[in-house]
Amino acid sequence: MHIHKKDLIATIKLNGEEINLDTANQLLKDPTLKPCHIVIHLEGVTELDEEQLDALFYLSEMVRAEGEHSFVVVYEHYNPDEFPEELIACPTLQEALDIIEMEEIERDLFDD
């Protein structure tokens, strides 16, 4: 696992073996990630099983629970027909950053 933080965005690179509930809980307990939008970059991962998707969904729900932070999965093999609607995902890091920016604008508009 590799974590890179820039401004209020934490990009976390995970390999296939690291995508599980233990890793999700470890990330949720990290106080340095609390104020951040989270991007999970599944670099080199070619397939996701149901257990891995469940772990990503759990992490997404926990991060987004308070409505203040975004959670996006970067998965280069992303296919919207095969990926759960509940998870926000895209094939590139730039798209993930764009999604976070759009969600920030939405939050600002609806908070006023």
Residue ranges, per PLM feature:
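Amphipathic, Lys/Arg-enriched alpha-helical "gate/interface" segment within cytosolic domains
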Residues: 2-112
